[in-house]
Design a protein with these regions (language model features):
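Ligand-binding pockets and gating/stacking loops
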Residues: 2-356
Length: 356
């Protein structure tokens, strides 16, 4: 499959996000170039198709420099560090800051031909999280919401179908789908899911719920609609979640101290650890955001902190998933709004570069 990825023609970021979403939904991977794949005997049921049951989407907010990470160059554009040899034969080399990922690069595939039409952060984020360009009157669903729409909730799982970690309440959410398909926002992985415990004793809590249901019942009978039903379903699912043993998946304190240290104590590291715990408990789609990639100034200094952190955490996540037998069923995707210019600017940084 890595060979096929390397052979495919240029694709846009929007096309890539649609293919990624389809993969998460159990639809055939990479329909672009499908004729070529069929000619070589690859299809559903053969290696490379249909294994993913979960997605961890690592979004690098700000426009990650591709040259210093996944698509290194030589000469004056390479930056402060020389490219390093990647493990295996399909990738070649990685940016000099990617020492840990180079050791596990035989487990990843790179698409180095993506392009975009926008160099604006907001539009780029929207495309990379929905697969659509922004339109004034429409809010499109996030990829996690699409997964819920097409696949439904995973049977027997009380946890939300999708979560977004380190984002607060920002993001497209359910879009034009019902509220029940909205990803649950986790602003701080150390804190986990907030406001989930009743503020009163159980008897008083149940009395309030019964009273609320009594008030709502006449409204539901008078205004029968999908929107009202979706709101009721959302409330019911929340009640189940509040009583579920699966809530412990949000509690990072249950992880061994050495595992938490290995991921790193920053929010991206702990966010990736939380994502692993959540998919382990049945969550289908977990997005983890990491900001700080808008490196217009002193890109080399910024990469010495941001880049090395991302490298260490990403490699730890891959190894951890593999050790727990989750890597085969989990698609881990990294994306960003756009790349950054090959030329270093007057402030020793790199500017927006949507053609990569």
């Amino acid at each position: 499959m890595k060979t096929e990825l390397n052979r495919l023609d240029d694709v846009s970021r929007r096309q890539f996000m649609l293919k990624t979403a389809k993969t998460a939904l159990g639809v055939t991977l990479l329909p672009i170039g499908a004729g070529r794949l069929r000619a070589e005997g690859t299809g559903p049921g053969t290696p490379g198709f249909g294994k993913a049951k979960h997605v961890i989407y690592l979004f690098m907010e700000g426009g990650m420099t591709h040259i210093d990470t996944w698509d290194p160059k030589t000469g004056s554009t390479k930056g402060a560090k020389d490219p390093i040899k990647a493990k295996g034969d399909s990738i070649g080399s990685l940016g000099g800051y990617m020492e840990n990922m180079a050791k596990v690069s035989d487990k990843i595939a790179l698409i180095r031909s993506m392009t975009s039409k926008t160099g604006v952060h907001e539009s780029g984020r929207y495309i990379m999280r929905t697969g659509y360009e922004p339109r004034g009157t429409i809010v499109h669903p996030s990829m996690g919401a699409w997964a819920s729409h097409f696949q439904g909730r995973i049977q027997g799982v009380t946890l939300p179908d999708s979560v977004v970690i380190n984002s607060g309440n920002a993001g497209p959410g359910a879009g034009f789908f019902p509220p029940s398909m909205s990803p649950i926002p986790i602003s701080n992985p150390e804190v986990g899911l907030q406001n989930i415990n009743p503020t009163t004793g159980e008897p008083m809590f149940q009395k309030r719920i019964s009273l609320m249901d009594e008030f709502d019942s006449s409204f539901r009978k008078k205004f029968e609609s999908d929107e009202v039903s979706a709101y009721t379903e959302f409330y019911d699912e929340t009640m189940k979640l509040m009583k579920s043993e699966d809530l412990k998946a949000f509690d990072l304190s249950q992880e061994p101290a050495d595992v938490r240290e290995k991921y790193g104590r920053d929010r991206f590291g702990q966010g990736c650890l939380l994502a692993r715990r959540l998919i382990e408990h049945g969550v289908r789609f977990a997005e983890v955001q990491m900001g700080g990639w808008d490196m217009h100034n002193y890109v080399d200094e910024a990469m010495n902190t941001r880049g090395t952190t991302m490298d260490s955490v990403f490699a730890t996540l891959i190894s951890d998933l593999e050790s727990k037998g989750l890597l085969e069923s989990t698609l881990v995707v990294m994306g960003s709004e756009f790349g950054r210019t090959p030329d270093i600017n007057m402030n020793s940084g790199r500017d927006h570069y949507p053609v990569a």
